[in-house]
């Protein structure tokens, strides 16, 4: 830090037993380092530090994507550590919920990162997660954000957790996500309607060497 930035870490720890990581001798983990800034709207914004871009390796640019009613498209067959940047066209989409199923395994388990149009919130839904807490997290969008007609999501996924940054850090959510054994796919989905994606990039992330 050069003294010009305010950087924080969050602490993630599960509180509902059984705790899957106990068997591996772990107890929680830190979030990504985040820079706190004051937005033009007067609110505090929190987004990953710029140095995170240096961990990107291979990038797949999907460009624009259109999904039909209840459509689904796999964007990664087996993802361990990835970053996803996507912009949803809210005006052109009709889905009640749409987003990403992460840690999607052959047994049908997954964690769902989605925009719920019925409540105007971005959600992390773990009801179908393979293990651990089935908790539900939400981040409300302001009237201004909803009226803008687009939603920007930056989603980080690794082996055991997910972090979601909404509209350049106006909201941030972190959650554990324990997958089943086997390949962990990422799927783009639309529920009860269509989905229009203005842009979507998937970056694989290299390790920082703490294994």
Outline where the language-model segments fall.
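Beta-rich accessory regions
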Residues: 1-211
């Amino acid at each position: 830090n050069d003294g010009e930035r305010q950087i924080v870490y969050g602490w993630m720890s599960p509180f509902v037993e059984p705790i899957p990581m106990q068997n591996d001798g772990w107890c929680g983990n830190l979030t990504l380092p985040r820079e706190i800034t004051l937005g033009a709207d007067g609110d505090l914004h929190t987004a990953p530090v710029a140095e995170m871009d240096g961990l990107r390796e291979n990038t797949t640019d999907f460009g624009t994507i259109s999904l039909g009613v209840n459509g689904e498209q796999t964007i990664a067959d087996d993802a361990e550590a990835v970053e996803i940047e996507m912009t949803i066209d809210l005006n052109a989409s009709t889905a009640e919920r749409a987003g990403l199923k992460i840690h999607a395994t052959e047994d049908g388990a997954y964690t769902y990162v989605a925009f719920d149009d019925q409540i105007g919130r971005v959600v992390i839904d773990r009801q179908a997660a393979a293990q651990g807490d089935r908790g539900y997290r939400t981040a409300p969008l302001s009237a201004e954000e909803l009226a803008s007609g687009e939603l920007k999501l930056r989603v980080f996924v690794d082996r055991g957790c997910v972090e979601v940054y909404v509209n350049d850090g106006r909201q941030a959510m972190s959650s554990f996500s324990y997958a089943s054994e086997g390949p962990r796919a990422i799927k783009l989905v639309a529920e009860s309607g269509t989905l229009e994606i203005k842009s979507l990039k998937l970056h694989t992330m290299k390790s920082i060497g703490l294994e």
